[in-house]
Every structure is written in C-alpha cells, then in structure tokens.
C-alpha cells in the first residue's frame, strides 16, 4: 500500500520539481499554449530556478513543499507547491499592492500520472497550515481561464474567483487568467 506525505523541499529536489513542472505543463497546457513554447521549455533552467527558490528564498515566509508517494520498494516525488507573501506577481493590472496578510500560491502541481490520490489536497492543506503559522489571513492564486481542473480543485477547497483578471503574453498570444481567493481561518478545523 502506498503512503502519501508532504515535506519541505530540499535543494536536491529541484531537478524533480522541474521535471514535474515540465511534464505537467506539457500535458495540462498542450491545448492552451503554442506547441513550440512548451517544446522549448528548458528543464535545466527550471531546475536552477527551483534550486534558488528553495536554497535562497526571499523570506522565511516563502516556501516550497513537495508531495511524496512512498511505496513498498521506492518513494517518488509526485508534486509540489510554492507560496509566499503576495507580491507584484499576485496583482491584477494597475492594482495597488495587497495587504501584508495576503499569501499567494505561485505553483501547485501534481504530475498527471500521480493525480487523484490526494497529493494536491495534502499539499494545499500543508501550505495553509504554514500560512496560519506565518499570520496570513487571506490567500490568492491565479488560474488559467481554460484550466477547469485547477479551478475545480481550488473551489472544492473553498476558493472562489475574486473578480480580478489578467492576460499573460505567451509568444504574442494572450492567455487569460482569473484570480481566486480564500479566507484563512486562524484555527485549523477540528477533527473528529
């Protein structure tokens, strides 16, 4: 029987995180982005970025977590989440800075072949626990308008659109996004 758990990412996880990001983007976004854009994503470049995000985070409130599936004979890194204080990348065009108590999810991906096993939910729950520790009371995340799976996943956890939108320029093609938000209860829900 497999066991899933979440832990803080370590610098040596950067390569696996980059591989998951690349695989997931090429699978989930293949109808959203031009094929040549996805084909030209550089795994080594992504790994260097993740190594820096893990090893030299801008603050103690910037975190990268990984989901691990532990089987009888091996363990596999199957997903990751990155978050921190909401910065300029969390903003809609011409929006003023968000308050200091707002967190932002920058990435939350589970490799498709490991989906539907609770890894995304565990990553999100662990992230919310850390937000509570860090004093965040609100969180935001951007989702592509065509990414129904991410929107449905976040909605199932209580997130909803906040009315903000933007479009990313991907090789002269505008890809619309909408922002979702959630209030963070300062106390975790009671368990039976």
What are these regions (language model features)?
Residues 2, 156, 170-192:
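Terminal substrate-recognition subdomain of acyl/acetyltransferases
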Residues 8-11, 22-32, 38-115, 121-126, ...:
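Acetyl-CoA-dependent GNAT
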Residues 17, 21:
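Hydrophobic pocket/interface hotspot
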Residues 88, 140-143, 155, 160-177:
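Conserved catalytic-core motifs of GNAT/GCN5-like acyltransferases
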Residues 110, 144-145:
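Short amphipathic helical patch at the helix-1/turn junction of helix-turn-helix
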Residues 121-122, 133, 145-163:
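Conserved active-site alpha-helix within GNAT-family acetyltransferase domains
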Residues 131-143:
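Conserved GNAT acetyl-CoA-binding A-motif
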């Amino acid at each position: 029987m497999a066991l899933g758990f979440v832990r803080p990412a370590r610098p040596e996880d950067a390569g696996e995180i980059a591989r998951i990001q690349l695989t997931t983007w090429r699978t989930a976004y293949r109808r959203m982005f031009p094929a040549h854009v996805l084909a030209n994503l550089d795994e080594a470049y992504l790994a260097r970025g993740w190594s820096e995000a893990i090893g030299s985070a801008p603050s103690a409130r910037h975190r990268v977590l990984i989901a691990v599936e532990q089987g009888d004979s091996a363990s596999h890194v199957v997903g990751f989440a990155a978050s921190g204080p909401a910065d300029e990348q969390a903003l809609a065009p011409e929006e003023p800075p968000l308050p200091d108590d707002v967190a932002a999810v920058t990435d939350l991906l589970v490799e498709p072949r490991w989906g539907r096993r609770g890894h995304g939910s565990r990553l999100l729950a662990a992230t919310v626990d850390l937000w509570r520790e860090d004093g965040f009371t609100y969180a935001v995340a951007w989702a592509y308008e065509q990414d129904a799976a991410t929107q449905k996943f976040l909605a199932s956890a209580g997130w909803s659109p906040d009315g903000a939108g933007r479009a990313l320029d991907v090789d002269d093609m505008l890809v619309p996004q909408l922002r979702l938000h959630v209030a963070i209860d300062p106390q975790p829900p009671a368990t039976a």
